[in-house]
Amino acid sequence: MTIEHLVGSAHFPDVVRLTLTLDAEYELDARLGAGSFGAVYRARALTLPASAPVYHAVKAIRKDPSRPDSVETVRREAMLHTRVTDIPGVVNVHGVWEDDEHVYIMLNYCAGGELYDWIEEDEFQGDDKHVRDIFVQILDAVRACHKKAVYHRDLKPENILCNEDGTKVYIADFGLVTDRKRSIRFGVGSAAYMSPGMSRSPDQCIGGEYNHTAYLTRSSDIWALGIILVNLIAGRNPWRTARLEDRQFWRFLGSIDEETNFWEHLGVSEELAVMLDRVFEMEPEMRLSIEEMREEVLSIRAFFAPQPVDTDPEKAVWRVACPLDASLGLHESEFLHGH
């Protein structure tokens, strides 16, 4: 079996025994994620003894001959990810290679898996210190990326990886990255984490982004950071999508007008609720900056409300759910035009 056969197939095995030669020989021994255009594998360096294995992650992306610009999309991902690879909270890029069929990106292997899984296991529930420590790491990494004009556009728990004990986190999956401060590419990313102006074309947007012909990529990342913070506290998303037809998002907008606390039913403290209202500001330039978010997060005494979470079905919310294979498919099949 060759890497071409493996990555180009419709189904990817969970565990493989396949040698791939890049800068050295590696054995691909586990599939970490897969989509229609690529797969991510755990790779063990064969130059080192099996008794003391050293692992990396290899992202293998199939070139689409029917869409020549898909190759440039992948190259842009690799180039911009490499630009920020020295940032402590970003998954390191160790090398990029190409053959006739694929582009390969070698990355740090993070043994703790996705932040999503830690949230699903309620690892943060009631632990203010853990929430603060992890979220400040995320803020610092994204802020450092922005300083280098790298805007992620797909921040979510599935794209944040953890070390083995869950004390360190790293931004990953730069498939939708851009270096442009404004973007006219709408509808990229994951719906629950998109800002209102990012999810739709300008004539369909709401709030301060209504008449804009482009959205601010920095502000859209800030919106996604706010959703991630809610995930850490509640283990849920506050709404499915930031659109008027979404019942929960409509309730949130109404709570601002009525000066009521939308966040109470998610078990969020009053201190944090005040901050979240400022993060989810409809006018993108009025949202808290990452620096302001960091200052607020460090000053908040408690993230969790003292009372139990409301279980009223009328206030139902949704579990975090956006699998990796869907993300890979979007990156390589849909995000091919515009930045």
Model-predicted segments: where are they?
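Juxta-kinase regulatory segment immediately upstream of eukaryotic protein kinase catalytic domains
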Residues: M1-T21, D29
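Short beta-strand micro-motifs within the conserved protein kinase catalytic domain, predominantly
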Residues: N92-E101
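Glycine-rich ATP phosphate-binding loop
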Residues: A39-K63
